[in-house]
Each structure stands twice: as C-alpha cells, then as structure tokens.
C-alpha cells in the first residue's frame, strides 16, 4: 500500500511540475510578445549575415 501511495504522490508532483513549467513558458512568451521571437530571429539573422559579410572581404573573390 505504501508503494502505491508513493507512486501516486510522485505522479502528482510530476504533474504539478509540468504545469508550472508550462505556465512559466507561457509567461515568457507573453513578456516577449512586443517583439515575438527576437532571440531566434537574431540568431538566424546572425547566421545568415556572417557568411555574406565574410565572402566579399576575401581578395581572391573580389578579383
């Protein structure tokens, strides 16, 4: 009987933890809503602009 109670309490704790994580993620999304996806767009923009900036600087390619 004790093992069943421990498993039940473990399930309750994991459920509450998952709910807490989802609430924190939604709050983070609401805080970033004025500029949605800023961290991801800046990372992708940096990844896209770094190679294009580097290519024209090579003298062999400009000749």
Swiss-Prot record:
Alphabetically sorted, this entry's keywords are: Lipid droplet, Membrane, Phosphoprotein, Secreted, Stress response, Transmembrane, Transmembrane helix
Q: Which Pfam families match?
A: HILPDA (PF15220)
Bilayer topology: Single-pass membrane protein
Q: What induces it?
A: By hypoxia but highly abundant under normoxic conditions (at protein level).
Phosphoserine modification, residue list? 44
**According to its UniProt entry, what is the function of this protein?**
Increases intracellular lipid accumulation. Stimulates expression of cytokines including IL6, MIF and VEGFA. Enhances cell growth and proliferation.
> This chain belongs to which protein, by name?
Hypoxia-inducible lipid droplet-associated protein
Q: Which organism is it from?
A: Homo sapiens (Human)
Supply the gene name: HILPDA
């Amino acid at each position: 009987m004790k093992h069943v109670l421990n498993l039940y309490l473990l399930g309750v704790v994991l459920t509450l933890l998952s709910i807490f994580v989802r609430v924190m993620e939604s709050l983070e999304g609401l805080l970033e809503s004025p500029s949605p996806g800023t961290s991801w767009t800046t990372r992708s923009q940096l990844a896209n602009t770094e190679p294009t900036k580097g290519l024209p600087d090579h003298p062999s390619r400009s000749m």
